[in-house]
Regions:
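Phosphate/nucleotide-binding beta-alpha loop and adjacent structural elements of enzyme active sites
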Residues: 1-285
């Protein structure tokens, strides 16, 4: 089994990039779009990961301070070295809709990329709920939230699912972001039991009365979460915008068809995600 990463909770700045590593990060972040730019950025990124030798790096990314561990999490690697390539279409779409009192629910929050992106652009009246079931990844999420002064992000350590109780999570130790409550192709990191709650129960417990946007990145468990939610939750809690990871090979139903039958329009398909907007969302506020 691959080496398990241990989180380092020292004060922010203890792992600030210096010297050659800092120059590699700067160069990778300046790489443009296009085939040649991406090839250069990915080459630099690989050099940087090797230079870190499993250590984290303290940087600003997506408008927030984060401690990122690129060795075992692809999302963290992207945010550290190439944030310009980190879901740019999704974040642009989301960014255009952020208001001072934005309500955002991040299901499968990982270490907080989306949640902190929203927090950096919303006002003090915003509410951001970041849900992450993996204990080690949740610990990184909490650390990153605490390095910023937003005071609008709340984290929950649980899995959103189709039941309340406990579920088995299958771990991919090479990419913590690929772990799932559905069996994953490379679950060489073993498995663990995590707390599970229905999404509707989570939101009710938080006292939310609306959701402006929700992101679901659950490595193939999106249907398990959304199907019971859209069947049973009050319509006032249906998100105006949904960003849903596109993993049809793992779903047990036609999730896009189900979502569209519930009154959502697909606005965009990107490399990894589907973006939906609820019919009439523009007039709901």
């Amino acid at each position: 089994m691959p080496h398990k990463q241990i989180n380092d909770l020292q004060a922010f700045g203890a792992h600030a990039p210096r010297g050659a590593l800092a120059r590699i990060i700067q160069a990778a972040r300046r790489a443009p779009e296009g085939w040649a730019g991406r090839r250069a950025a990915y080459f630099l990124r690989a050099l940087g990961v090797r230079a870190l030798r499993g250590r984290p790096a303290d940087v600003e990314s997506l408008g927030a301070r984060m401690r990122l561990y690129p060795a075992d999490n692809v999302s963290e690697k992207r945010m550290l070295f190439t944030p310009q390539y980190f879901d740019p279409q999704e974040l642009a779409y989301l960014g255009q809709r952020i208001t001072a009192d934005f309500v955002f629910v991040d299901v499968g929050a990982n270490v907080g990329g989306y949640s902190l992106f929203v927090a950096a652009r919303a006002g003090a009246a915003a509410r951001i709920l970041a849900i992450e079931p993996q204990p080690e990844v949740h610990e990184r999420l909490v650390y990153n939230v605490r390095q910023n002064d937003f005071a609008t992000v709340k984290t929950l350590e649980c899995a959103a699912a189709d039941c309340d109780g406990e579920v088995t999570m299958f771990l991919d130790s090479r990419n913590r972001g690929d772990s799932s409550i559905r069996i994953v192709p490379n679950h060489d990191g073993g498995r663990l039991t995590v707390r599970a709650r229905r999404l509707a129960d989570i939101l009710a417990g938080e006292g939310l009365d609306r959701i402006d946007a929700m992101k679901l990145d659950c490595e193939g468990a999106e249907d398990l979460i959304l199907e019971p939610f859209l069947r049973g939750a009050p319509r006032r809690l249906w998100p105006k915008v949904m960003i849903v990871e596109h993993m049809p090979d793992r779903w047990s139903m036609d999730l896009p068809g189900f979502i569209e039958a519930k009154g959502y329009r697909r606005k965009l398909r990107t490399k990894h995600n589907l973006i939906y907007e609820r019919d009439g969302a523009e007039s709901l506020r």
